Amino acid sequence: MSDKNILHNFLLVLILSFTWQNIFAQKIVFGQITDGQTLQPLDGASVILENSNIGTISNHIGMFRMKLPSKSSRRIKVQYMGYKSRNIILNKKLCVNDSICCNVELQPKNNILSDVIVLGKSKAQRHREVPSAITIIDSQELKYKTATLNEILDNAAGIKVAQQGGLGNASRIIIQGMDGKRIGIFINGMPMGNSDEFQLSSIPIDMVDEVEIYKGIIPAWLGGDGLGGAVNIRLKDFKKNHLEMAFEAASYNTYIGSLQLKHYLGKTSTALHAGATMNYAKNNYSFSSPFELGRIIHRDHDAYTHGGFNVGISSQQWWFDQFDLTLSADYYRKEIQGGLMNVQNNIQHAFTRTRSASTSLSLEKSFLKGKLTAQFHSIVGFSLVNQVDTSHYCYDFIGNRFPSGSGRGEIGAVPNDSHDRHTTVRELLNLTYKIGNNQLVTWTTNYRYGCKMPKDELADSYSRLPTSGYPSRLHSIVSGLTHELKLYGGKFTNELGIKLFNHHSEVLPFAEAIMLQDKLKASTNRCTMAGWSEAMALHLLPNNALTLKASVQSTVRMPIAEELFGDGVLLLPSEKLRPERSFNINAGAIWLINAMRYPQVRIGINTFYMSAKDMIKLMYSSMNMAYDNIGKVRVMGIDMEMESKLNRWLDLQGNITWQDARDMRKEAVGGGENFHYRYRIPNMPYLFGNVGVRLHKDGLLSKSSSSAFASTFAFTKAFSYNWEASKHNTMLIPARYCWDVAVHHSFNKRFQLSFEIRNILNRENWAEFRYPMERRTFHLKMKYIINKI
């Protein structure tokens, strides 16, 4: 080999060496810090590079990211209060491309002094201490349940879920006297619509890690609109390879199944995840008709079917601190049950069906050495909705069959075989900037788009009009700016925010379809409003055991697609709807007694006042229905809750809520005196609560086993589903009492078995509009978990 070639090769090796050193100098260490026992993320854990002043802290999801300078130590120290510190060597096995992936599990300190156990504050308790009025349902409360999310929420303080039957039937969430469309639903912070649009029963409880219920004020970072509050569902995020399968069988041919899979690619933080759900319920129970004494009605056309799956990829090692892309598809089919509001209409053939597909993208990135954090969530969904009502015959509950009054169809004036196409886009952008150690500025923008393309050729041929309506579009933007200030070492927190609400819709009103024969023009509705809020929290006593909080808010709820577009069957378009407005006040306190040892007791109290106007209500005519702005409502009330951990194996809990919602319109619709002025709002429970006890013990049957027994008793005072104009009101929903018991056993932390009896007293209970509920039901659930796949 010539000297020239030797020199050339030497220079090449030298250049490559310097290049490698430069790449290594720019390495970034990243990862997630979690509790080694619960795998919950640790917010605020410190990561320090040995023999340097370089360090960082983990964010709210436990993620950290830190640059490693050249020739620095390759050892980091991870610390968190109440946990054992860890020293970690960053070796080549952790390298991923030009970065180092280092996920850290910290073990809690085992501070045991005789029978005194140091407990400290859980993540859920820290969430409760925020300025907003909030109820937290954590993973420990969900652990022993076989119930659906609707039933879980129904037992929370200040919350009531009004259902119209078994699994798959319509339900609405009531928070502080506001219900349904006024309650926002979020999943991992992403707005999914309101509680009327989104079916909580479609989410298996085994996929849920925590439920946050915001009462009155919706936090700025959620970014949605609403009057009564919001429900944010945090799904489980597994930090290791994980496969989980669950199946439940219950009375009345009810079956619920779910599967969750997450598989990490090698030793990277990139993972593939998938999930599947299956729900089926025949709902074939009987009830005593409230309209005809002695008549027993059997629900024989109320079956519900739901199947869904999702696949996706997530990563923490790419340019983004957090990346997740998910594709999902769902199928729903629901039979329509007759005889609920009368005894004549025994529907036997009509049903609804929905097929949908969506894609969701979540991104998170920190800038400026962690001072600025950007989060972006996007969901694009498509759905095809069918309402099928084509029978030539109608039926009654005596067994008679007779021809349909319109020739075909059991429900409306004309038959239906609709093929309505819906397109939805929901996007959320959060920017959070940290100023020093005690200030945060958050800017949030939420965009929502909805488009309906109705089609029902069968109905149009009978009515000779486009019965299902015309194409309609909806755009809305909610943008808000919030400033958070913490003083006196975090003992005082103040949040001040402002929001702008913009609404734009294009709807072809149904009235023009009747009156005009030429080309129709869309009715355009534009509206821009502003809202504001202020919330504060003051922590007192050692360990911040007492938290006082108060909040005030002027907020807006914009009309949704269903209210504007109609349904093409009985519900007409309402193109001139105005947004609802509300002024809300909340004040409360949380007292944590013996925060660091047994017996531990938490007492919470919250009072509220709300004054809402331009309330959107459903108005009835002889043939159809339509929404209109006619309402003015005042709500006031109080909710209290108590939770106690008496010792290692015994927990107690209870709550009670009183709310008073009144009609405050002095003038009736169309003029004249409103005879319902100051009457209680119909179909709104005003006094309800529940108590529960839970016994749990580890190692009872074997060293790695866990056993539990739980019992809850819930009550709802009788209330009217019409205006209480007379002391002898016949439209009354009787008081509801329900006693449930459950046992749970976990074998070697993999196989779990649960058995629950609901309504053990076998009472005949009724829900809103006196819809009948199930009597005693039995539920058997099995779950199997594999952490090595």
Regions found by a protein language model. Give the residues of each.
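Face-selective signature of the C-terminal outer-membrane beta-barrel domain
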Residues: 312-332, 354-517, 523-535, 539-543, ...
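Membrane-embedded beta-barrel scaffold of Gram-negative outer-membrane proteins
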Residues: 541, 549-553, 580-636, 657, ...
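Short acidic/polar hinge/loop motifs at secondary-structure boundaries
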Residues: 65-67, 190-216
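Periplasmic-side early beta-strands and strand-to-turn transitions of outer-membrane beta-barrels
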Residues: 240, 248, 265-348
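A beta-strand signature from Gram-negative outer-membrane beta-barrel systems
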Residues: 102-104, 205-242, 787-788
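Gram-negative outer-membrane beta-barrel transporters
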Residues: 491, 602, 607-611, 628-720
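Short strand-turn segments of transmembrane beta-barrel domains in outer membranes
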Residues: 210-212, 219-220, 235-264, 295-304
